[in-house]
Amino acid sequence: MSIYAKNPIMPGFYPDPSICAVGDDYYLINSTFAYFPGLSLMHSKDLVHWEQIGNVMDRNSQLPLMKAGHSQGLFAPTIRYHEGVFYVICTNVSHGGNYIVTATNPEGPWSEPYYLEGADGIDPSLF
């Protein structure tokens, strides 16, 4: 079976994408900077047709953006799946630094962020 895809596959604003496969499903997350709700989560069965299934950071308690400027907020998230749990690691450059959130269902609910003390820098990844 062959599938033809146009470029870009996802027109619009989806910077710094990260993707993971779980069985026949693909999940893609991207930077959302100072926008709320944060971290758009997309789903696809074929890597061509994508549908937004939610936002990882969708509660005010998860995402303090009061002091975030236009070029701040959430940078370059990474999504992974291991033994029944989805993990997202990301940087909130406006508040707290690097953090991890988890969920057993990609549509949520996602946990409150666990900030990683001493893990300075931006654009973290999990392996």
Please identify what each model-predicted range represents.
Residues 1-127:
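Carbohydrate-active catalytic/glycan-binding domains of CAZyme proteins
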